[in-house]
Swiss-Prot record:
The keyword Ribosomal protein does not apply. InterPro entries: U2AF_small (IPR009145), Znf_CCCH (IPR000571), Znf_CCCH_sf (IPR036855). This is Splicing factor U2AF 35 kDa subunit. It comes from Sus scrofa. Residues 65-82 form the RRM domain. It is found in: Nucleus; Nucleus speckle.
Amino acid sequence: MAEYLASIFGTEKDKVNCSFYFKIGACRHGDRCSRLHNKPTFSQTIVLLNLYRNPQNTAQTADGSHCHVSDVEVQEHYDNFF
């Protein structure tokens, strides 16, 4: 039984682990996926979380309220970043 489970791990036949997430590190079903998304302990891919900060999410005044940032300013910020 253990050999069988090992042979189907990460394949379409595996009903517990998500084969999409196992192969490419992303799942087309997202949070709605019924299978497990096991994150590897090591990877050749570097993940840089929160690298780009959208000015619409971060622009605040001194009193803590959000500033309005135009779509043109957001696009310029994005273009300059990338």
